[in-house]
Amino acid sequence: GNPKKGNKALSMVPLEGQLAEADNWNYCVANVSSKQNLVDVKSNVKNSQFATPLFEFSGACSGCGETPYVKLITQLFGDREMVANATGCSSIYSGSVPSTPYTKNEKGQGPAWANSLFEDFCEFGLGMELANEKMRDRIVKLFNQILEGDNAPAEAKEVLKAWIENMYDADKTKELAPQIEAIIEQGIAAGCPVSKELKGLTQYLVKRSQWIIGGDGASYDIGYGGLDHVIASGKDVNILVLDTEVYSNTGGQSSKATPVGAIAKFAAAGKRVRKKDLGLMATTY
C-alpha cells in the first residue's frame, strides 16, 4: 500500500527505503530541462515559478517565511545577483559551512553571496555596488579607446557602442556579453594591449543585480544608520528587509519592528511603543 495515504505532506519514513529515490532525483537534475524560456517569468507571480531557483534546500526552520522571498529573488535575478547579507537567520541558512543553498544554473552562473555584520551590512552592499560601478567605468574608457582607434573592424565597434548605450539594461548586456568576449579574444590574438586588460573585466559586462538582505534586528535597530545612508545615496541597490517583528535568530526578543502591545521577550507586558515605520522613512528620499 501507499505509505503516505492519510498522512500529511511530509511523513517520516526509514532512510533505507528512500535511497533508491536518489537515482531518480539525479536523473531529473541531469535530464529535465528548465522551462523558463517558455513564458515571460517576470510578467506575473505564477510565471515566476517556472524559473529555476538558484536557492535550494536551505535547512531553514520548517514553515520559514523568509526563504520563499530569497528563493524568488534568485529565480528572477539569480544569474547576475550579488548579495550582501547581514548576520541573523538569513546568514545561518544561507551560509552554514560546509554547504550553501545558493547554487548555479547550467551555464555556471549564480548568485555571489557574502555575509557581513549587523551594523554594516548596508554599507557592505553599497561598497559592492560602488566597486562594480568603478570597474564598469573602466570598461567604458577602454571601449572608447578602441572606438577612437583605427584597428578594430566596424562590426566590432558597433557592438561596443551598443554596450555603452545599453550598459544599464540587464537583458541587452546579457545578449551582447558573448559577442564582446569573442571580440576581446580576437583583439588578444592580434596583440591588442587594451583587449588584454578587458579580458580581466569580462565578468562586469552583464549588469549586476545588487541585493542587500537583513532582518529587522539589522534593518530597524543595529544597522539602521547604514540603511538610511544607503537609501539616501540613491544608488542602484535593492534592499530586502526580512521583517519577522522580533529578533528571530536569538530567540524572539522585541525589536523596533515589534508592533505596539505585542508580547515578546523583553516585552512581556506588551510592547510599549509603536512599530517604527521604516517604509515611510524610506519615502523621505
What feature does the model see in each segment?
Residues G95-E133, V241-V246, Q253-S254:
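Mobile "lid/hinge" segments at catalytic clefts and subdomain interfaces of large enzymes
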Residues V32-S33, Y93-S94, T103, A190-C192, ...:
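Thiamine diphosphate
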Residues L117-P193, E197:
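N-terminal leader/propeptide and maturation segments of large enzyme subunits in energy/redox metabolism
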Residues G1-N7, C61-T67:
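Cysteine-centered iron-sulfur cluster-binding motifs in ferredoxin-type domains/subunits
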Residues V70-K71, L76-T87, G95-T100:
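Extended, highly charged accessory segments
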Residues N7-L10, D79-A84, C89-I92, S209-W211, ...:
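Beta-sheet entry/capping signal
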Residues N2-N47, Q109, E155:
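Non-heme iron-sulfur electron-transfer modules
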Residues N47-A60, N115-L130, K134-G149, V206, ...:
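Conserved thiamine diphosphate
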